[in-house]
């Protein structure tokens, strides 16, 4: 039950963060495409004359810090639990959990510094390209930690889930690196937000496939260490059942990718409608000044006379 609750929390946090970043990215590129540049953090809009709203501008960043704190504490606490159901038993589980906790602590340090630099005038805010570079390193470390976690699992399903999660983290790392070098690359910014949403959906699917009996693939069962009373994730004893379960997970991952693409289309449409953008037919560009306007009209008249 604890594993499923944590997966639900991680899924909700990542989906909220990714969707918020996606909405802000679309809004800024639609409203001011010429001055658009990717930002690691978008504060809530400022409302003139509303002090309470202005104080809540950093609410998304505060929620991110709280989520990272919970993730860091969770990985730290479970490192003290025994887990004989992984390769290498409890010592390997302990170091693997501490490795994940260290990655979350890195993200937490960056988020806390960003909050303090936005609030206190004594701290100089870090440039956006440096923040994206740090995020790229953090996502790469998470990719490394997830890959190492997949390697020590005796559960083939959990190993495959961790492997797919690692690939999403590797994609996020690459996109952050691109944004550090090309901050005006809108496609990379939108893809980064979509990848975070995909990671959130995959965390939910991982929890359902490993810890909820109704979603466990056919022919698989929960692991249990009877002597230690330790429950693990899902294991398939028969090779045919394992291959079928892995194929089901691959299919579900593709379904989640399709859902994220649909979410991207819907979000862009709704943001464009909220920003007042409407689809129009073809038009001829208007001249910029009055002299160009008179020349434009004269050319039109001359063309009509010649015809």
Placement of each model-derived feature along the sequence:
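Transmembrane-helix exit/juxtamembrane "anchor" motif
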Residues: 19-33, 211, 261-284
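Hydrophobic alpha-helical cores of multi-pass transmembrane domains in eukaryotic membrane proteins
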Residues: 8-22, 61-74, 97-113, 129-148, ...
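Eukaryotic polytopic
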Residues: 125-128, 132-135, 145, 157-234, ...
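Structural signal for the C-terminal ends of transmembrane alpha-helices
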Residues: 20, 27, 115-117, 178-183, ...
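Eukaryotic helix-linker segments that join adjacent hydrophobic helices
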Residues: 10, 32-118
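Juxtamembrane interfacial secondary-structure elements that flank transmembrane helices
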Residues: 19-36, 76-84, 208-218
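Non-transmembrane, juxtamembrane loop and terminal tail segments
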Residues: 36-48, 224-235, 278-307
């Amino acid at each position: 039950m604890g594993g499923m609750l944590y997966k639900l929390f991680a899924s909700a946090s990542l989906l909220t963060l990714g969707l918020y970043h996606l909405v802000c990215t679309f809004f800024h590129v639609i409203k001011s495409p010429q001055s658009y540049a990717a930002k690691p953090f978008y504060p809530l809009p400022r409302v003139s004359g509303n002090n309470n709203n202005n104080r809540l501008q950093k609410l998304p960043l505060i929620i991110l810090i709280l989520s990272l704190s919970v993730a860091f504490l969770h990985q730290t606490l479970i490192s003290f639990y025994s887990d004989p159901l992984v390769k290498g038993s409890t010592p390997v589980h302990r170091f693997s959990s501490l490795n994940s906790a260290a990655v979350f602590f890195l993200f937490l340090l960056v988020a806390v510094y960003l909050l303090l630099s936005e609030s206190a005038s004594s701290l100089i805010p870090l440039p956006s390209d440096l923040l994206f570079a740090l995020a790229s390193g953090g996502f790469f470390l998470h990719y490394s930690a997830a890959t190492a976690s997949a390697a020590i699992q005796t559960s083939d399903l959990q190993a495959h889930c961790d492997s797919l999660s690692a690939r999403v983290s590797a994609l996020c790392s690459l996109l952050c690196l691109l944004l550090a070098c090309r901050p005006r690359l809108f496609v990379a910014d939108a893809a980064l937000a979509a990848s975070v949403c995909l990671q959130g959906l995959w965390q939910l699917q991982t929890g359902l496939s490993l810890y909820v009996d109704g979603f466990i693939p056919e022919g698989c069962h929960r692991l249990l260490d009877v002597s230690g009373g330790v429950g693990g994730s899902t294991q398939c004893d028969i090779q045919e059942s394992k291959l079928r379960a892995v194929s089901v997970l691959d299919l579900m991952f593709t379904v989640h990718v399709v859902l994220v693409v649909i979410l991207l289309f819907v979000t862009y449409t709704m943001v464009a409608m909220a920003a007042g953008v409407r689809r129009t037919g073809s038009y001829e560009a208007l001249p910029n000044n009055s002299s160009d306007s008179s020349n434009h009209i004269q050319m039109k008249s001359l063309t009509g006379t010649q015809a």
